[in-house]
Amino acid sequence: MQFCRFNVDRLGVVHGDEIFDVTDALDTLPDVKWVRSLHDPFVAALDQVAVKARALLASAPRLNRNDVVLEAPVALPSKIIGAPVNYHAHLDEAQDDHGLHQGAKVHPIDEIGCFLKAGSALVGDGATITLPKDAARVDHEAEVAVIIGKAGRDIAASDAMACVAGYSLALDMTARGKQDRSMRKSCDGFAVLGPTLATPDEVADPAHIAFSLTVNGEVRQASDTSLLIRSIPELIEMCSAFYSLLPGDVIMTGTPAGVGPVSTGDTIVVTSPELGVLTVNVA
């Protein structure tokens, strides 16, 4: 199923241009006693919610996708994890382009590991990103994101896919400069996720998810997860060796070659045959 959040925490199932409002399926969620749980309650209970959502589809109100405001499909990730330079072609361009490396040494993912983005950077499809005034430049980085469905620590790659709740498109927006990576990657709107959470049955082979990015209609990035240096199971193993992964945690798997700057007025579109279309505007 393709789940979306829309119009302030309503739950929808996406079929083409229609959204079926199945918000009542959230009645299956347990009561949260604290102000904020440590994980995303919707993702933690996704299997139960999906059963209720299927039962509601026949009678659910239908809305046109153009008439709703989509939010990031995950509301409360405890962590947004990024995988730097996880495509060989991007590693090559990052080492060669001063605009990307800004004079700093570029390390392969096996040397530098992963990084964290602030949860406050999270936005969904249709968002407007405001460029920070102190950035040397801001670049687009199209990615496939993995959404964790089951808690785990020290997860072996051979067991990793059983922990996956679904997949989404992502933009790991990045400001260039001398500041620490976490500062440059955590500006408001710099973690774009959407348009939906596609459950594993929607993806034929997560090792072969094709995706591309355009800016104002010009193709800048096009790749496939088969070209990842560290595969999705290997990334889950790597991350869980350092962090407990919780339901709703987002792992952005890395961006391919073609990273480039964006400017005020640009429209960025990330497209995947299986994961849909993710659009943001730059202000």
Located regions from the model:
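N-terminal non-catalytic cap/leader segment that marks the start of a structured domain
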Residues: 1-104, 108, 201-204, 212, ...
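Glycine-enriched loop-and-adjacent helix/strand subsegments that border the catalytic/binding cleft
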Residues: 71, 77-233, 242
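Short beta-strand edge segments in extracellular beta-sheet folds
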Residues: 281-283
